[in-house]
């Protein structure tokens, strides 16, 4: 994703690395991330199903997820979806990104050998809402770093959870998608004017 993005945008590796680690962001952008993460994990928090055996485990999981999960955002939110949005509306671009991202994950799990342990429908619903979270964040902020960080938070917090209320989770995912669409559409309108 990085190489294609650099070529397409006539950029450089140095600029890509700078964007990847651009932690200096407006506080409201970080608040947006916290709102989405809070909503995404609300069913787990309310059910008391977050498992944190040691204080340092979330930090280790976050750093691991930053390297192995967050790096995906170079391809998905930094290149693929914005390129689609040059020709397609936000909703269609996000759904196309979701389909591609789903296939990528399913192939990865197949190669990894963990496909049989995945509960497919809940995983895909979570991936759909996460796709909307990340696309809204990027559309609103144009920050690769915020997408990388959010992806890493989602991956690491997901590893600290065991079960959640299915119905509450479904309602929250719908709310997340609606909120993401609202944020993205207002951002697209602002950029046009």
Language-model regions: role of each:
Residues 37-45, 98-108, 152-160:
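Aromatic-anchored segments of alpha-helical transmembrane domains
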């Amino acid at each position: 994703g990085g190489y294609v993005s650099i070529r397409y945008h006539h950029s450089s590796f140095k600029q890509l690395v700078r964007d990847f680690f651009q932690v200096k962001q407006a506080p409201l952008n970080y608040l947006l991330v916290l709102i989405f993460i809070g909503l995404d994990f609300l069913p787990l928090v309310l059910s008391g199903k977050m498992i944190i055996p040691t204080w340092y485990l979330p930090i280790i999981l976050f750093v691991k997820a930053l390297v192995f999960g967050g790096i995906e955002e170079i391809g998905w939110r930094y290149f693929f979806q914005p390129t689609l949005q040059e020709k397609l509306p936000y909703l269609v671009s996000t759904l196309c990104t979701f389909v591609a991202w789903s296939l990528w994950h399913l192939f990865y799990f197949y190669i990894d050998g963990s496909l049989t342990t995945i509960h497919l429908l809940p995983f895909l619903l979570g991936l759909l809402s996460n796709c909307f979270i990340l696309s809204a964040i990027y559309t609103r902020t144009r920050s690769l770093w915020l997408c990388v960080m959010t992806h890493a938070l989602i991956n690491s917090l997901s590893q600290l959870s065991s079960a959640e209320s299915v119905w509450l989770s479904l309602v929250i995912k719908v709310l997340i998608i609606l909120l993401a669409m609202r944020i993205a559409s207002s951002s697209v309108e602002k950029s046009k004017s």
